[in-house]
């Protein structure tokens, strides 16, 4: 598959480019309709860079909107947005799932991530291409969790999650998944992505379909 990854977070884009196998991958700031139309899948790295002032916040959100608009015009098949689990500000003893309401902190970077998701969800309701939101636990490091972080993802788990989302054809046009490395004090459930095959459009259902008698 031909995959375009948005530039802007060098660490994440390098991890994906160097570890996603079996695909043709390009990292680029050129998010014009003409360029996006050359790809099957677009991976947006949300607004994970630091946001320093309100003007930068506005530019980031406008950039997300423009990128999604170009995706619509280019008839791309799938868009994956890499977001962050940091937009949940619940107590440590809570176990959070994909259905929980986001509670962003009053801080520009956190707000920019949350607003990016809001725009993505609106496009998810309106346009027919497949849109997948992957909230990731940070920090992202290539080592096992030492149980000091309740929200942590090693690189292997992150890459495997993105690879699954690229390869699968989901039943629904919009889905949200959480990914973090499992630990004794994990704050976020990852059952949904662990059992992602159950959401495949290729999976035959087991409901009874009455046979219609031809007249």
What are these regions (language model features)?
Residues 175-215:
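Conserved C-terminal active-site "lid" loop/helix of NAD(P)H-dependent oxidoreductases
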Residues 2-22:
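N-terminal Rossmann NAD(P)H-binding glycine-rich loop of SDR-like oxidoreductase domains
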Residues 88-89, 125-149:
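Flexible, glycine-rich beta-alpha linker
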